[in-house]
Amino acid sequence: MENLTPNGELLDLEDKNIGPEQLSLLCHAEDLSSVKQLFLSQNEICAESIEILSRVKGFTGLVSLYLNNNLIGDEEAKVLANAEIFKNLKCLMLEANNIGTKGAEALASSPNLKNLEVLFLDSNPIGPQGARALACSEKLPSLQALHLDSTEVGDEGTQAIAESPYFNNLKKLYLCSNKMGNVGAIALAKSESLKNLNVLSIWRNEIRDAGGQAIADSQTFMNLERLYMSLNFIERPVRKVIRGSDLAKRLTTLVMD
């Protein structure tokens, strides 16, 4: 098959103008069980194509699915959430689509994502309720990395994540460009469930001195290795406190203007 690597593990259909007809061919492919990674990014994939993709049975060994930069909305997300193709996934890339609260709720309640370790929902308007749905889900027990940059979650969504009883295994959390202020930052700093984080990215938000101080004093981030918090509203004296804190001494990377 064209665009399949010699070992049969990667099928790259990114930006190949893949429409319903081409996806239908996948439905009839004899054996796709060796494919571990499927790239379908940048193909303007929408409703009809998602319906077809959800019926593909051959990708029994698929662990990574890339659907970023398409036209996937809430209804398409609902279809995907119940798709056979999801059952063994460890990585799902849905960045830069049009998935809102309902779509996030569908993914959060999917019976097929129990093995998922990495979820990319950056640049989708899931909002605070979408974040809450993910945070309250028992269906994502393996999740280790959650990418929610530019998802409009704000303080409310950040609080829901910080208070989640199900994110104890989370190691990487990305919340850039979400208009998060002190409330969200303080919630993260006081979280009882985010103690295994080793990467936290909260740059380009609206965190001020109180939020910055809470992060510096936090006992939550004992395992944190990398912290990205540039482009907030933290004044120089508090930035100095952060740089001199025990937290900063433990970090391998601190990015802060």
Question: Where are the model-predicted features located?
Answer:
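Leucine-rich repeat
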Residues: 1, 19-28, 47-55, 74-82, ...
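LRR N-terminal entry segment and analogous cap-like coil->beta motifs
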Residues: 1-51, 63, 68-71
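Inter-repeat linker/turn residues at the boundaries of leucine-rich repeats
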Residues: 6, 30-33, 57-60, 84-87, ...
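Conserved hydrophobic beta-strand positions in leucine-rich repeat
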Residues: 11-13, 38-40, 63-67, 89-94, ...
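A generic tandem-repeat structural signature
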Residues: 45, 51-126
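Eukaryotic tandem repeat interaction scaffolds
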Residues: 117-206, 211
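Leucine-rich solenoid repeat scaffolds
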Residues: 216-257
